[in-house]
Design a protein with these regions (language model features):
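Acidic, glycine-rich flexible loop segments
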Residues: 115-148
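Exposed boundary/loop context
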Residues: 14-16, 63, 98
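Conserved short hydrophobic patches within well-ordered secondary structure
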Residues: 2, 112-115, 162-163
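Bacterial N-terminal signal peptides
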Residues: 9-19
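Bacterial N-terminal signal peptides that target proteins for export
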Residues: 1-11
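Primarily secretory-pathway and cell-envelope proteins
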Residues: 22-84, 135-176
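Mid-length scaffold segments of soluble, non-membrane domains
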Residues: 79-128
Length: 176
C-alpha cells in the first residue's frame, strides 16, 4: 500500500514539474525577427491599398517581427510608380501592425500605414489617405558596410528593433 502511495506521489510530482517546465518555456519564448523568406504571401499581401490605389509590394524587401504571443508587425517596400510625385517622395513602404507600437517615441495604434524616409533626415508615417501622422528624426548610418534595400534588425535593448531602408533607420518597439 505504501509503495502504491509513493508511486502515485512521485507520478503527481513529476507531472506537476513537467507542466511547470512547459509553462516556463512558453513564458521564455522570444520574439522572432522575420526576413523576406520567412514571410509567406498569405501574411504580407502582394498588393496594398494606399491613397485610392493599389500598389505592388516588393516581397523580396519585406521584414517583420513575430512576437512571442503570436502577433505580427510586418513591413516592406512598395512600387509607388503610379502615384503623384508628392506622394512618391514620401511613400516608400507599407507597415502592418497587429499590436500598438512606439516608433521614434510616437504611439501608433494597430493598423496599416504608409511610411518613408524623407529629406532632412526624417521618417514619416502616414495613414491610408496619405495624411502625415507624424515625422520624427531618423538615423543615417554612413558607416554601414553593405546596406540592403530593407531589413529589420534587433535594437540596442531587448524588445527594440531597427527598421532599415538602405542606410536610414528608425527604432520601434511594442507599446505597453
Amino acid at each position: 500500500m505504501r509503495f502504491r502511495v509513493s508511486i502515485l506521489a512521485a507520478s503527481l510530482s513529476f507531472l506537476l514539474a513537467a507542466s511547470l517546465g512547459i509553462a516556463q518555456s512558453v513564458k521564455e519564448s522570444k520574439d522572432t525577427i522575420l526576413k523576406a523568406a520567412d514571410i509567406p504571401s498569405t501574411l504580407y499581401p502582394e498588393r496594398v491599398f494606399f491613397r485610392g490605389k493599389t500598389a505592388p509590394t516588393q516581397h523580396r524587401n519585406t521584414a517583420g517581427v513575430h512576437f512571442a504571443d503570436g502577433m505580427y508587425v510586418l513591413a516592406g517596400l512598395v512600387d509607388s510608380s503610379g502615384y503623384a510625385t508628392s506622394i512618391k517622395a514620401k511613400y516608400q513602404g507599407y507597415l502592418i501592425a497587429e499590436v500598438p507600437l512606439e516608433i521614434g517615441g510616437q504611439h501608433v495604434n494597430p493598423g496599416a500605414y504608409g511610411f518613408g524616409f524623407i529629406q532632412g533626415g526624417k521618417f514619416v508615417l502616414m495613414d491610408l489617405g496619405a495624411h502625415d501622422l507624424f515625422q520624427v528624426d531618423a538615423h543615417h548610418d554612413a558607416a554601414m558596410p553593405h546596406p540592403v534595400p530593407f531589413q529589420i534588425i534587433a535594437g540596442s535593448s531587448a524588445g527594440t528593433y531597427l527598421l532599415f531602408s538602405g542606410r536610414n533607420s528608425i527604432e520601434f518597439k511594442r507599446a505597453e
